[in-house]
Amino acid sequence: IGLTWRGQPLLGALAVPALDRPYWAAPGLGAWCNGAPIQVSGCTSLGESLLVTGFAYDRHTRLDNNYAEFAYFTHRTRGVRRGGAAAVDLAFVAQGLLDGYWERGLSPWDLAAGMALVEQAGGVVSAYDGSPADLASGKLIACTPGLQQPLVDGLANCRPLTGASFGAPELDPPTP
């Protein structure tokens, strides 16, 4: 559950019952899990980072699906995971279990609670270009402060600006 004020996340609450992890965050109170304060990891190196992302449900009609980005970061980090739920991925970044997150094609209700968690845990949440995140845009970076610029740069440079190519022929979507 996320509460926003003027388009920005303010409060966040999230439960991951399978792991017995309730999370919550509020301005001035920080971010918490199971009654203990949490914070983002101290990772500052893309090469040492462990990232997480997601993919749109319909890869054949979403040509901006995330394959090029996934390939780019997979070869430049310790690894990239695919968690499945944006809010949980963001909670894991807030807790320092993962170092960074990016994804596109999301709705405000996917992001609001997790954004509040990351920010209150000392992380950075932004648009792909590094500007302030916009819930309505559906795309987001969330990470440690030291990883923001490498993620912004990677997202800007991982695919050709003009073509339909995803950076590697084997990653291009099938033609109908």
Give short role names for the model-derived ranges.
Residues 39-176:
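An extended, acidic
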